[in-house]
Amino acid sequence: MIKTKKNRYEVYALGQHICMSPHKARRVIDQIRGRSYEETMMILELMPYRACYPILKLVYSAAANASHNMGFNERDLVISKAEVNQGTTVKKLKPRAQGRSYPIKRPTCSITIVLKNTSVNEEEFKRYQYTINQPGGLITKEKYTDMRCYDMYNNGGLWDKK
């Protein structure tokens, strides 16, 4: 097992068991990889594919994780990694005439979206951590708190479509 170190500038969202072919989801994922968050949202809203909506929800969820958990600004987020993996296959039987049945295989996929904050420089963060760990340095970590008040009935216009 390879251990990967978690990056403090990255947040992710993982969607599993999405009823869609991985090949069809990769078509959309290849278009948004490496783009900014705002540009990605515009592209996904205007693309005519069925795979766009689950990916749009995942990107939106990853950005919400970034702003709520880490205090990142949505303008500074870039999709650093987006991957689609094959999931389990849902197997069903379709009844046919004269007591026969045909198998139906529905492919599923799992999608991982990783957003990276471009405003934070790694060297600044290391210097900040160094001053915290020094004796006589900062006693407590400064935590970014956002005191904006959101209008929860008017803010989420994305979820109206099905």
Curated annotation (Swiss-Prot):
Molecular-function annotations in GO: rRNA binding; structural constituent of ribosome
InterPro entries: Ribosomal_uL22, Ribosomal_uL22_bac/chlpt-type, Ribosomal_uL22_bac/org-type, Ribosomal_uL22_sf
PANTHER family for this protein: CHLOROPLAST 50S RIBOSOMAL PROTEIN L22-RELATED, LARGE RIBOSOMAL SUBUNIT PROTEIN UL22M
Main location: plastid
One GO location term (cellular component): chloroplast
Signal peptide range: none
Protein's job: This protein binds specifically to 23S rRNA.
Keyword entries, A-Z: Chloroplast, Plastid, Ribonucleoprotein, Ribosomal protein, RNA-binding, rRNA-binding
Record has Ribonucleoprotein as a keyword: yes
Family matches, as NCBIfam families: rplV_bact
Protein name: Large ribosomal subunit protein uL22c
Description of how the protein assembles with itself and partners: Part of the 50S ribosomal subunit.
UniProt keyword Hydrolase, yes or no: no
